[in-house]
């Protein structure tokens, strides 16, 4: 086995969301968070000698400025001629290789856009080609799937059965079905003959959570769908769904967190021990950053890699040889693993054996060509035409069952389906063959179409009244260029031979493997403190020892385990490094040399052994907390990150070290001050957590920030996929927009050899400078809105200017250096110091509204940092979101922080993304779910014991939820909805308050909770009965309200507690008028509804005087 980690395969340090290997095995495409598509050569990835050869290109092409947002999916067509990409910009683009290389600069190949598919209303999560290349399917967060034909790339059908975001697709290898998996916790199988739902599978996903992708796959024999994100007995599983009756088969058990991607090898293997036994290989990738390899013939996993990645695995792709594969992760890296035939226990079968295998399952309806590819419905017909009829071939799979299902659905039998089924592939196949031949000729005729010709077929032309034509332009790539099918990337002959011989080592046994590349070292050269960019390699030695099977992994029946292990739910154990000699790692420097001497490396190795299972100390002084045996990318990491502390590459290392020492001194002084002055009224933490600090912004000589007019919470949601990027500043030059703050920092050397920094602030509007100021010091953070802007310097001085450049406030000295500086669109400025204290100023009033309030308490806070911060528009309440996804808002009315996110609430049936509510509360809570998915693996370096001391896992919470009685679940749901109402009030979100009020009313109505409904309605109606009893004695008592004073829970306190007629600007009685029809849906409540309805109508008809209005008029 060989494991490689080429860090030069990168997307600027951002996440890599998709990876796919070309059918010829010599190219691999990646799509990432930088909105780029990159095509790499596989030889340097899979072979060290090719990586070192300067004559072999690594990056073949980088497609830039095409997509506007993150590229979520890249897929090669089955013939390898085209590459499809799907992005957050709602576009699917088709790329082809042009033989016009005149425009090439730094790349080897020229890939141009052949077609742009528009039709989705939201992010495209995955694209997938049909097995016969006749269709391409795209799925999106708009809850739909669009089928496009690949002749002219036009829409064929739009499938809209899903109720939530569609996050994964897989085609039946026989072309009969398409399967899609969605956030609505369902797997839908569609018939490709008429694009109608065949069945919906929901059972394994009822208790599953959410993840950014749900990528299922289909086994090459067509017998099983391997679905993701399954939950079985509070354990995360990969789910096998049988083709025969769409029943749940086996569960692949062992991942600690959700399985988000499954990929099946396209090969069918024959077992070495039993030649008659055939099996398939399945790869699973999870949020626990673990890869697991499974065989359909074994109840246990064949391989587990736990330390290859630091974060969630997003995509996997098999090589065409069936022995190797690549995977990509949210941490922005790619891994390559190559296995030997003996390690998987078999070898791929040939075309003849494959033909016999398929005939046993599907009869003569499926045949195999000379290359081993499936041909559909070719019995007695033309093979070429049958191949092109692929998706519409009617296979005789359970014909009686299918006929009965269609008969029940339609009432009477369909002539087409009846003929197709009864014919058993006879007349039905003939019809499909004719269509297939026609399509085949069309495919041949369009195979030479160029981008310009194809665009002319799709472009829109409008005839104007004057006879002129208006043509809507379509992006077609780079002019008229010939699109050719890419040929395999050539490498020298001696490297081909070396590549062939590199896999000649064979293990001695067929046992499950567990690899942990971060814990197996063989030489001092594998120092984790090295900053080189070499490829990490793990290979088997010539005399491997027998490897211990991984106990908790096993194929699990729905009602029992196959492997008989009683420790089924235990965590996978880590093997002792001292007893494991199966793998070794060595690092090679291909880009730059390490600046550490041997003594430093040895010290780093010792520190790594002692700290590898501890939580990283964010911002602390221990520089060895960044130790990792895997090589890191040479590109800069984001400033705000959960990852370990990095060293600055600028010339200000000494200055930053002095700042860190001063910061530590300040923390110690503050701690002593707090202990010696217990009676001080200042809001200062009595104990500052040891080592807790927030990373300071990266020092740069140019800062530009665009002042955005949209609400801050909306931008926070839009940027949720990049939570670790600095929310305050960007260093990208040439920012466009209406208003820009631009800062240029210069340094001047004085006579005493000291350096003085000056910052020039320019306020630009449509590239026109409105004003300019020059201040002493080095500005680190800027923020503002269209009315004012604020800046802080390295010396911890805060300046605030108005829109004309006049100082509003200046020389404000916070308690420490600032790590965050944020503003809203009105008058509030938020600042967070590096030691975790929050201040909010009202700039218009020139006064502080929150002074040095410590961040909220969190368990293990020293291992967390702030993801982003914001301040609300109306009242200027600070909102802080931590790296674990938890969000808090400070309420001056309560005088404490209020937690917005709720892990138990995430299990509620009402907590779903399928809502049109997009207020600040749902934004923050959705952010919590998405960020926890993206960064779910950030604590992988924490030991199992420390994880147990932290918050309970989702699996345990699910187990707890499942064990609750119906009454307990009702109490939990009621509590969750009441929390939502309270949080909406704290955040002053009136629309969300109304949204949750209606849901709360509906829930109480379904449960027939008369006490809480009466409480709610009485509060919305107001203390009318009590006040009128006092003002009018008993004139309207029981006549108008129908309620006695004792029946009104608010009546006894109505005189002492003033009642407000509005809540968050909404009229309470108008809200009561809206919820009464909901309550009327339960006839048990009709008497109570009638009483409140009568009282409400009395006010509108002036029969009953509104006592609240009477009190106001006095």
From Swiss-Prot:
User: Where does the record place it?
Assistant: Nucleus
- PANTHER family xref list: MEMBER OF THE HIR1 FAMILY OF WD-REPEAT PROTEINS (PTHR13831), PROTEIN HIRA (PTHR13831:SF0)
Task: Report the family membership.
Answer: Belongs to the WD repeat HIR1 family.
Q: Where is the composition biased (Basic residues)?
A: 581-595
Disordered, as annotated region: 405-449, 499-682
Gene3D superfamilies in the record, alphabetically?
Answer: YVTN repeat-like/Quinoprotein amine dehydrogenase
SUPFAM superfamilies in alphabetical order: WD40 repeat-like
User: Which regions does the record annotate with the repeat WD?
Assistant: 10-50, 66-105, 119-158, 161-200, 209-251, 262-304, 308-347
Q: Where is the composition biased (Gly residues)?
A: 412-429
Taking the first listed entry, what is the main subcellular location of this protein, grouped into a coarse class? nucleus
Query: What is the name of this protein?
Result: Protein HIRA
Low complexity: bias regions: 515-545, 649-681
Q: Name one GO cellular component term.
A: HIR complex
- GO BP terms, alphabetized: chromatin remodeling; DNA-templated transcription; regulation of transcription by RNA polymerase II
Biological role: Required for the periodic repression of histone gene transcription during the cell cycle. Promotes replication-independent chromatin assembly.
> Which keywords describe this protein according to UniProt?
Chromatin regulator, Nucleus, Repeat, Transcription, Transcription regulation, WD repeat
Composition bias, Basic and acidic residues: 565-578, 596-611
Q: Which GO terms describe its molecular function?
A: transcription corepressor activity
Q: Sorted alphabetically, which InterPro entries does this protein's record hold? A: CAF1B_HIR1_beta-prop, HIR1-like, HIRA-like_C, HIRA_B_motif, Ig-like_dom, WD40/YVTN_repeat-like_dom_sf, WD40_repeat_dom_sf, WD40_rpt
């Amino acid at each position: 086995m060989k494991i490689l980690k080429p860090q030069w395969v990168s997307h600027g340090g951002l996440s890599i969301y998709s990876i796919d290997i070309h059918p010829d095995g010599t190219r691999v495409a990646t799509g990432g968070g930088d909105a780029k598509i990159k095509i790499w050569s596989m030889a340097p990835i899979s072979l060290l000698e090719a990586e070192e050869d300067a004559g072999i290109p690594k990056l073949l092409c980088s497609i830039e400025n095409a997509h506007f947002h993150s590229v979520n999916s890249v897929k090669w067509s089955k013939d390898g001629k085209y590459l499809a990409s799907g992005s957050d910009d709602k576009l699917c683009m088709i790329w082809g290789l042009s033989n016009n290389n005149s425009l090439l600069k730094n790349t080897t190949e020229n890939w141009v856009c052949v077609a742009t598919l528009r039709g989705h209303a939201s992010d495209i999560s995955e694209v997938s080609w049909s097995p016969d290349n006749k269709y391409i399917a795209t799925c999106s967060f708009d809850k739909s799937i669009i089928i496009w034909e690949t002749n002219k790339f036009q829409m064929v059908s739009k499938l809209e059965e899903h109720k939530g975001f569609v996050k994964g697709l897989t085609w039946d290898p026989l072309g009969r079905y398409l399967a899609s998996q969605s956030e609505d916790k369902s797997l839908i199988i569609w018939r490709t003959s008429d694009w109608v739902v065949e069945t919906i599978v929901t059972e394994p996903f009822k208790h599953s959570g959410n993840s950014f992708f749900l990528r299922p796959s289909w086994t090459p024999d067509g017998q099983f769908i391997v679905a993701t994100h399954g939950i079985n007995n509070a354990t995360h599983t990969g789910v096998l769904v049988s083709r025969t009756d769409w029943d749940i088969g086996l569960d692949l058990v062992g991942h600690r967190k959700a399985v988000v991607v499954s990929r099946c090898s396209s090969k069918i293997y024959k077992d070495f021990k039993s030649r008659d036994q055939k099996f398939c290989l399945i790869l699973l990738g999870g949020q626990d950053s673990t890869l697991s390899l499974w065989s359909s013939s074994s109840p246990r996993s064949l391989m587990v890699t736990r330390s290859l990645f630091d974060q969630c695995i997003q995509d996997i792709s098999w090589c065409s040889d069936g022995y190797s594969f690549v995977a990509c992760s949210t941490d922005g890296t790619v891994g390559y693993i190559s296995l030997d035939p003996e390690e998987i226990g078999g070898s791929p079968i040939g075309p003849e054996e494959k033909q016999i295998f398929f005939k046993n399952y599907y009869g003569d309806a499926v045949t195999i060509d000379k290359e081993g590819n499936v041909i559909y419905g070719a019995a007695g017909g033309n093979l070429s035409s049958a191949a092109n009829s692929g998706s519409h071939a009617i296979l005789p799979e359970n014909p009686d069952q299918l006929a009965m299902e269609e008969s029940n659905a339609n009432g009477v039998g369909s002539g087409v389906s009846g003929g197709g089924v009864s014919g058993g592939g006879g007349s039905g196949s003939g019809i499909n063959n004719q269509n297939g031949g026609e399509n085949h000729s069309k495919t041949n005729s369009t195979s030479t179409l160029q981008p310009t010709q194809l665009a002319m077929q799709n472009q829109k032309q409008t005839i104007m009244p004057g006879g002129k034509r208006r043509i809507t332009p379509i992006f077609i790539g780079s002019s008229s260029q010939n699109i050719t099918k890419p040929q395999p990337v050539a490498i020298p002959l001696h490297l081909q031979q070396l590549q062939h011989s590199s896999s000649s080592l064979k293990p001695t046994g067929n046992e499950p493997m567990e690899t942990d590349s971060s814990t197996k070292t063989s030489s001092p050269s594998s120092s984790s403190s090295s900053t080189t960019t070499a490829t990490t390699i793990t290979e088997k030695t010539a005399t491997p020892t027998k490897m211990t099977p991984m106990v908790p992994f096993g194929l699990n029946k729905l009602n029992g385990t196959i492997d008989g292990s009683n420790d089924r739910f235990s965590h996978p154990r880590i093997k002792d490094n001292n007893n494991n000699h199966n793998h070794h790692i060595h690092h090679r420097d291909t880009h730059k040399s390490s600046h550490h001497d041997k003594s430093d490396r040895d010290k780093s190795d010792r520190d790594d052994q002692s700290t590898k299972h501890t939580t990283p100390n964010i911002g602390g002084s221990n520089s060895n907390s960044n130790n990792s045996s895997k090589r890191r990318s040479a590109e800069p990491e984001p400033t705000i990150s959960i990852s370990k502390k990095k060293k600055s590459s600028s010339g200000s290392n000494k200055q930053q070290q002095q700042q860190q020492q001063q910061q530590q001194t300040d923390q110690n002084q503050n701690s002593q001050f707090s202990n010696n002055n217990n009676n001080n009224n200042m809001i200062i933490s009595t104990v500052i957590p040891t080592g807790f600090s927030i990373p300071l912004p990266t020092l740069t000589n140019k800062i530009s920030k665009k002042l955005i007019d949209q609400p801050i919470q909306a931008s926070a949601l839009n940027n949720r996929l990049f939570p670790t990027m600095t929310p305050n500043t960007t260093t990208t030059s040439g920012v466009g927009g209406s208003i820009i703050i631009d800062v240029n920092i210069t340094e001047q050397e004085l006579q005493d050899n000291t350096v003085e920094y000056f910052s020039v602030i320019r306020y630009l509007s449509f590239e026109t400078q409105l004003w300019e100021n020059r201040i002493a010091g080095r500005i680190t953070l800027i923020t503002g809105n269209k009315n004012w802007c604020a800046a802080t310097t390295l010396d911890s001085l805060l300046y605030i200017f108005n829109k004309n450049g006049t100082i509003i406030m200046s020389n404000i000295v916070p308690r420490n250096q600032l790590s965050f500086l944020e503003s809203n669109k009105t008058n509030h400025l938020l600042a967070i110091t590096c030691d975790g204290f929050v201040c909010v100023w009202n700039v218009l009033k020139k006064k502080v509204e929150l002074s040095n309030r410590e961040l909220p308490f969190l368990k293990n806070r020293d291992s967390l940092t702030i993801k982003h911060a914001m301040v609300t528009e109306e009242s200027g309440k600070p909102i802080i979101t931590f790296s674990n996804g938890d969000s808090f808002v400070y309420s001056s009315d309560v005088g404490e922080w209020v937690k917005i996110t709720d892990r138990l609430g995430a299990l509620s049936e009402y907590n779903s993304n399928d809502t049109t509510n997009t207020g600040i509360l749902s934004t923050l809570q959705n952010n919590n779910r998405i960020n926890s998915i993206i960064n779910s693996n950030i604590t992988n370096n924490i030991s199992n014991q420390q994880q147990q001391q932290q918050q309970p896992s989702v699996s345990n919470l699910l187990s707890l939820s499942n064990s609750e009685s119906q009454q307990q679940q009702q109490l939990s749901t009621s509590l969750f909805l009441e929390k939502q109402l309270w949080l909406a009030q704290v955040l002053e979100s009136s629309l969300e308050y109304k949204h949750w009020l209606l849901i709360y009313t509906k829930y109480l109505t379904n449960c027939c909770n008369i006490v809480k409904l009466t409480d709610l309605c009485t509060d919305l109606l107001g203390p009318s009965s009590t006040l009128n009893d006092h003002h009018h004695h008993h004139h309207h008592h029981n006549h108008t309200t129908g309620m006695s004073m004792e029946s009104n829970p608010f009546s006894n306190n109505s005189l002492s507690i003033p009642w407000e007629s509005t809540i968050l600007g909404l009229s309470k009685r108008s809200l009561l008028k809206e919820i009464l029809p909901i309550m009327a849906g339960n006839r048990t409540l009709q008497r109570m509804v009638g009483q409140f309805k009568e009282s409400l109508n009395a006010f509108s008809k002036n029969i009953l005087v509104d006592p609240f209005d009477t009190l106001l008029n006095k």
